[in-house]
Each structure stands twice: as C-alpha cells, then as structure tokens.
C-alpha cells in the first residue's frame, strides 16, 4: 500500500435543492453548515458546524440553510472539527467568486458506535471527492451516494455493519485499490510499513494442506529466538486459547502486545517423519522487534579466466519506510568486501510505499533522471525526477522480477531498466500501475484512495499490462527465496546458486563484464 503527496484539484461546489416547504425529522440529524465560503485559487476559507439533535422537531429550509423552528435539543459538538476538515478538504476553487452557503442534513444513529462510523463516512467521502483519480466516480452521482449510505447506516446497531455499508459505497467506484481498513487492520498494516512492532519475533503461516499454524522463522535476537523456537514447530495455543480455525494474522495479533508483558504459547514439535514428538509450553516476554525488508548475501564464483569474483545479492521483500536506508547499508557493506556486480531480487514483492520505491531507485542512479510519470485525474502527465543524484555503486546490476512483482516494485524496475541501469530477468510483472494515498481517519481507520496512474520513464503503460523482462526465466527450485531463507549468509549461498533465475542473472552479469558494458 503507498503514500504520495497530492495537489489541489478544482472541484465544483455541492448544490442541494432549496425548498421552503417545512418537513419533519423524527430522528436526530447530523447538520453540516458552511457559510460564506470564498473561492480562492489555492485555499478555501470556511466555517463549518456540526450538531446532533435528540428530539423531534420541524425544520424549514431557505436558501440552502437549515433554520430550526423549535428549541434546539442537546447538541454534541465534539465532532465539529472532523467534519469541518472533511468538508473543507473536499472543495478547492480557482476563481474569486463568492460561493453559495451549503447545508447537508442526515439522520444520525442513536447507536454511538454507528455514529462514529457515520462521521468516518463523511470524512472518507470528502477525501475521495477531492482526490480520486476518476472525476466521474465511475459515472455516478457521488453526492447522492453519501446521502444514500448515511440513510442506510441509520437503523444499524453495530460498527461492523456500518463499516460494511461504507465499504459497499467504496466498491461502487469500481476500483479495488480504493478501500477502507478498520482501526485494528490499520495497526497491522503500519507494522509492515514502519518495520517496527512490539511482540515476540515469530514468523508464522498456515500450512496449506492442514491449515495448522507453523513457525517459519524467528527474528534473530528476538524473545522467540532466545527461547530456542525452531522453524517447522506447530503453534497450537496462545494464552490458553486453542488455535483451531484461527488464521495467521489473527494469531499474530494475539502474540503482539505492550513491551514488558508476557504471552504463553504451546508448540508441537513435529519430527521428520511427520509424527508428533511432544508439546512444550514457552512463556515469552514481549519486546520491540525490528523488521528489515532487506536481506543480502555474497555469491562467490570463478570467472571463465580463473579469477575469483563476487556478486552481491539483495532481496527486497517490501517497500517500507526503512527500505532505502537498509538497502544503502547492505550495499555499502558489500562494496567494502569488493563485490563487483549485483542482483536485486524483487520477485513476489507486492509493493508498499511509493516514496520508498523512488528512494531505492536513487541509490542506483546518477543525475536528474526521470523515475516515473504520473497521470492525475485531469489526465495531466507529470514527471518525477531526481535532483543531482549520486549512485551508491556503478557496478553492473540485474533485477529479478516475476508476476508477483507489483506496484512500487514495478516503479523501481521500470526506473532502473528505462534509464539503462539494469537488465530485467524473470517473468512479466503483475501490472498494478496505480498509486494510492493513505490517510488515517479520526476513528483510527485508514482510507486508501487511488489518486493517479503511472507510466515508466519511457512512457510505457504498466497498469494491467506489467513490465516484460529482457531475459525470461522461471525459477526451477522455488517461486522465490523468502527473506527468512536468505537471512543468514552462510546457509543461503547454496540455495541461491540452485535458483535458476539467479544463475541466469549471473550469466548476464558475466556477459556484461566480458563485453565491458557500463551500467
């Protein structure tokens, strides 16, 4: 999932029909009023208010402003700031003309948790109205969708049901990448983005045949590592709760917690014959866990003329906030060990933060190269260029890609390939040429909005097309080497040398060295 900086867009103001006919509202209403908003080229001055009314009353509309004809009931103003932001952010103007006043009235649920989601709905609706890449909103009336969804939420009694309605509204945009995740889901997402968590350092996954939770590896130096937990052990219980029908993400959430607290787990040791060899109980302290998206190894080999050469292998599993700095450190370390060429493995890397992808590209390029082109909602194509870049190394480079390389992986591969820096080896990439902004909303949920499409530096379409490699290969051993496999250099080199695509990459690097080709 990715973060970009988006610019202001020119949008029309909302217009609602004015009516002088009184009408009765037999339920609380949410009222958003914005008065005397002056359109300016780059900003919007507005005054917005939100009120909740808990009694039945008669209201009349005149010139777009709601006027109460009865005594105002108990008013809760705690949400005013949030809705004010949602309204003001959704409108950007380009002329000094005076805008009309605007009032929107919606029925507000009496269930507090549903009311919170209604507020999130308004917030999400405004952000999409401002930034979504398709200004037609999939050829529908986006203003009406807000009213319709708010009314549909009114009779609900649970936040889960209300979030379901919000997500259903987003699905009408026809873009699977524009979506909302709940506060709990967002916390898990952030762990993958910032590379830090509080837990025990276990990598677990569901065994495909049985569905049992199996330990894949431990983070080196973590509580799990210090306790001697091994790859292949089956996790059967957490704090007395059996894990039947519990998926790996739910189990991982149970293992996480505040530093200094403890979690007790039970592990089943399965021997090589597949039979059980006992269950043991382990009490683990939770600690800060540092996750790196980078793993590396040095592959020594002998050249045709008998010289010893070294190839640096770098596996990037995701584009987190630390990806560029971690990669820079890994390359510097290998440069100090006289590495003469590099393989950058992006296979099965689904993407992440776009900014991280651009930062990684700049580690390999010089000058003012174009890294990618973006196409905004108005169809305007704009380049994103480096400024006085200085590569960490100029040694020859091969990038490994496959059908699992997506989004920021494709931005990076395209930038290195189209600027003549790297050869691509593998299979055609996934083809996700859309960029999402990520915004944390007031309730702790997060909204992903597709704000732009992107093209490679050679203006090649990527979305739903992908990037074709220069040299095709399919890994014979396994689809891709995971970070856990290549974490320890000594044990990883034989595995790397058995990877057919790594072998192809080494052949291409040797050919470039023999031909004296610059990278």
Curated annotation (Swiss-Prot):
It is an enzyme of class 3 (hydrolase). PANTHER family: CARBOXYL-TERMINAL-PROCESSING PEPTIDASE 3, CHLOROPLASTIC, TAIL-SPECIFIC PROTEASE. Residues 186-274 form the PDZ domain. One of its GO terms (molecular function) is serine-type endopeptidase activity. SUPFAM superfamilies: ClpP/crotonase, PDZ domain-like. One of its GO terms (cellular component) is chloroplast thylakoid lumen. Its EC number is 3.4.21.102. It is found in: Plastid, Chloroplast thylakoid lumen. The gene is CTPA3. The keyword DNA repair does not apply. The keyword Zinc does not apply. The active site is at residues 407, 432. This is Carboxyl-terminal-processing peptidase 3, chloroplastic. PROSITE patterns: PDZ. GO terms for biological process: proteolysis. Keywords: Chloroplast, Hydrolase, Plastid, Protease, Serine protease, Thylakoid, Transit peptide. CDD domains: cpPDZ_CPP-like, Peptidase_S41_CPP. It holds the Pfam family PDZ_6. Belongs to the peptidase S41A family. It catalyses: The enzyme shows specific recognition of a C-terminal tripeptide, Xaa-Yaa-Zaa, in which Xaa is preferably Ala or Leu, Yaa is preferably Ala or Tyr, and Zaa is preferably Ala, but then cleaves at a variable distance from the C-terminus. A typical cleavage is -Ala-Ala-|-Arg-Ala-Ala-Lys-Glu-Asn-Tyr-Ala-Leu-Ala-Ala. Protease involved in the C-terminal processing of the chloroplastic D1 protein of photosystem II. This proteolytic processing is necessary to allow the light-driven assembly of the tetranuclear manganese cluster, which is responsible for photosynthetic water oxidation. Gene3D superfamilies: 2-enoyl-CoA Hydratase, Chain A, domain 1 (3.90.226.10), 2.30.42.10, 3.30.750.44.
């Amino acid at each position: 999932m990715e973060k970009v900086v988006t610019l202001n867009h020119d949008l029309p103001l909302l217009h609602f029909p004015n009516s002088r006919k009184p009408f009765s509202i037999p339920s609380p209403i949410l009222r958003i009023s914005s008065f005397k908003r002056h359109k300016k080229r780059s900003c919007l001055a507005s005054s917005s208010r939100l009120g909740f009314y808990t009694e039945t009353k008669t209201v009349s509309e005149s010139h777009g402003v709601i006027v109460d004809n009865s005594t105002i009931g108990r008013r809760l103003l705690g949400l005013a700031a949030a809705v004010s932001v949602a309204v003001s952010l959704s409108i950007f103007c380009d002329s000094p003309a005076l805008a009309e006043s605007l009032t929107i009235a919606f029925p507000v649920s009496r269930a507090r948790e549903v009311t919170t989601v209604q507020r999130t709905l308004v917030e999400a609706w405004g952000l999409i109205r401002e930034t979504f890449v398709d200004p037609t909103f999939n050829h529908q009336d986006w203003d009406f969708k807000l009213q319709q969804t708010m009314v549909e939420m009114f009779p609900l009694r649970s936040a889960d049901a209300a979030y379901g309605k919000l997500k259903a509204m987003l699905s009408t945009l026809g873009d699977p990448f524009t979506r909302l995740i709940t506060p709990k889901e967002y916390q898990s997402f952030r762990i993958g983005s910032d590379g830090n968590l509080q837990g025990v350092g276990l990598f677990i996954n569901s065994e495909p045949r049985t569905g049992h939770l199996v330990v894949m590896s431990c983070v080196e130096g973590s509580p799990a590592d210090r306790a001697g937990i091994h790859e292949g052990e089956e996790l059967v219980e957490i704090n007395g709760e059996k894990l039947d029908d519990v998926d790996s993400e739910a189990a991982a959430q149970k293992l996480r917690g505040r530093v200094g607290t403890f979690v007790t787990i039970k592990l089943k040791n399965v021997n090589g014959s597949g039979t059980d060899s006992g269950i043991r109980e382990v009490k683990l302290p939770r600690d800060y866990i540092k996750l790196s998206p980078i793993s590396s190894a040095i592959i020594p080999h002998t050249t045709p003329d008998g010289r010893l050469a070294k190839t640096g292998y770098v596996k990037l599993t995701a584009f987190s906030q630390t990806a560029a700095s971690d990669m820079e450190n890994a390359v510097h370390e290998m440069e100090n060990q006289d590495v003469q060429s590099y393989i950058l493995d992006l296979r099965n890397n689904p993407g992440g933060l776009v900014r991280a992808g651009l930062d990684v590209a700049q580690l390999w390029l010089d000058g003012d190269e174009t890294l990618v082109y973006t196409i905004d909602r108005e169809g305007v194509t704009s380049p994103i260029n480096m400024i006085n870049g200085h590569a960490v190394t100029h040694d020859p480079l091969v990038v490994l890609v496959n059908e699992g390389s997506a989004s920021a992986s494709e931005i990076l591969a395209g930038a290195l390939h189209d600027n003549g820096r790297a050869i691509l080896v593998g299979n055609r990439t996934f083809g996700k040429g859309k960029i999402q902004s990520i915004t944390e909303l007031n309730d702790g949920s997060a909204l992903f909005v597709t704000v732009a499409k992107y093209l490679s530096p050679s203006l090649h379409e990527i979305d739903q097309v992908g990037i074709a490699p220069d040299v095709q290969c399919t890994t014979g051993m396994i689809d891709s080497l995971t970070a856990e496999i290549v974490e320890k250099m000594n044990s990883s080199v034989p595995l790397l040398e058995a990877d057919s695509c790594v072998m192809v990459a080494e052949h291409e690097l040797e050919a470039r060295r023999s031909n004296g080709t610059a990278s």
